[in-house]
Swiss-Prot record:
<dbReference type="InterPro" id="IPR023673">
    <property type="entry name" value="Ribosomal_uL1_CS"/>
</dbReference>
<dbReference type="InterPro" id="IPR016095">
    <property type="entry name" value="Ribosomal_uL1_3-a/b-sand"/>
</dbReference>
<dbReference type="InterPro" id="IPR023674">
    <property type="entry name" value="Ribosomal_uL1-like"/>
</dbReference>
<dbReference type="InterPro" id="IPR005878">
    <property type="entry name" value="Ribosom_uL1_bac-type"/>
</dbReference>
<keyword id="KW-0810">Translation regulation</keyword>
<dbReference type="GO" id="GO:0019843">
    <property type="term" value="F:rRNA binding"/>
</dbReference>
<comment type="similarity">
    <text>Belongs to the universal ribosomal protein uL1 family.</text>
</comment>
<comment type="subunit">
    <text>Part of the 50S ribosomal subunit.</text>
</comment>
<dbReference type="GO" id="GO:0006412">
    <property type="term" value="P:translation"/>
</dbReference>
<dbReference type="GO" id="GO:0015934">
    <property type="term" value="C:large ribosomal subunit"/>
</dbReference>
<dbReference type="GO" id="GO:0000049">
    <property type="term" value="F:tRNA binding"/>
</dbReference>
<comment type="function">
    <text>Protein L1 is also a translational repressor protein, it controls the translation of the L11 operon by binding to its mRNA.</text>
</comment>
<dbReference type="InterPro" id="IPR028364">
    <property type="entry name" value="Ribosomal_uL1/biogenesis"/>
</dbReference>
<comment type="function">
    <text>Binds directly to 23S rRNA. The L1 stalk is quite mobile in the ribosome, and is involved in E site tRNA release.</text>
</comment>
<protein>
    <recommendedName>
        <fullName>Large ribosomal subunit protein uL1</fullName>
    </recommendedName>
</protein>
<keyword id="KW-0699">rRNA-binding</keyword>
<keyword id="KW-0694">RNA-binding</keyword>
Length: 232
């Protein structure tokens, strides 16, 4: 490993090795140890006591963060002509159908979320090879396949995110920006962890939330005591 920069040294000094911080402490500390010139994203990693290889222990869901993600989310709506006006009014960045399907077939994926209607899914199935690996495939479980595309656009723009546990049992997602206040960071983290708790599979045995780490794009991870999440 190369030499630590001055800022990395300062950050390392602020984090006590082996200590599990309260969520309240971590929400302030992550701001103190981030020295980027840009507004870094805040990431949370939660290790769950599940075996994701078993279908009855898969954890996936959606959560509406009270303060949003701080990111500009680019939304494409693939819909029938009668739904286009409502989708545009709701704030969709791109609205249409066949022309965008052709663009995606050609490799265009300059978007963050795709919302569509059940009747359109037959056309979108062929795009799986392009959209699947990028996590862009619309899914009824995440609310991106719906008759009410306008409502779905508003929810995504306001901070609704979807997530799922990876092969190693970790759920990783972004819950805001370093510019958020400690209270906003804490509120978003609490909402996310509360949602995970509600999704605990009945087949999961033992400790469900094994560890929680909060970090920014360029910072070290701060270990959080899971018991502190519900503290007022």
């Amino acid at each position: 490993m190369g030499k630590l920069t001055k800022n990395q040294k300062l950050a390392a000094e602020k984090i006590e090795a082996g200590k599990a911080y309260s969520l309240k402490e971590a929400a302030s500390l992550v701001k103190e140890i981030t020295f980027t010139k840009f507004d870094a994203s805040l990431d949370i990693d939660v290790r769950l006591g599940v075996d994701p290889r078993k279908a009855n222990q898969m954890v996936r869901g959606v959560v509406s963060l009270p303060h949003g993600t701080g990111k500009e989310v680019r939304v494409l709506v693939l819909c029938t002509p009668d739904a286009e006006a409502a989708a545009k009014e709701a704030g969709a960045d791109y609205v249409g159908l066949d022309e965008y399907i052709e663009k995606i077939k050609g490799g265009w994926t300059d978007i963050d979320v795709i919302i569509t209607m059940p009747s359109i899914m037959g056309k979108i199935g062929a795009l799986g090879r392009v959209l699947g690996p990028r996590g862009l495939m619309p899914n009824p479980k995440s609310g991106t396949v719906t008759m009410d595309v306008a409502k779905a656009v508003k929810e995504v723009k306001q901070g609704k995110i979807d997530f799922k546990v990876d092969k190693s049992g970790i759920v990783h997602t972004s819950i805001g920006k370093v510019s958020f206040s400690p209270d906003q960071i804490r509120d978003n983290a609490k909402e996310f962890i509360s949602t995970l708790n509600k999704l605990k599979p009945t087949a999961a045995k033992g400790t469900y939330i094994k560890s929680i780490y909060l970090s920014s794009t360029m910072s070290a991870g701060i270990k959080i005591d899971p018991k502190s999440v519900d503290e007022i």
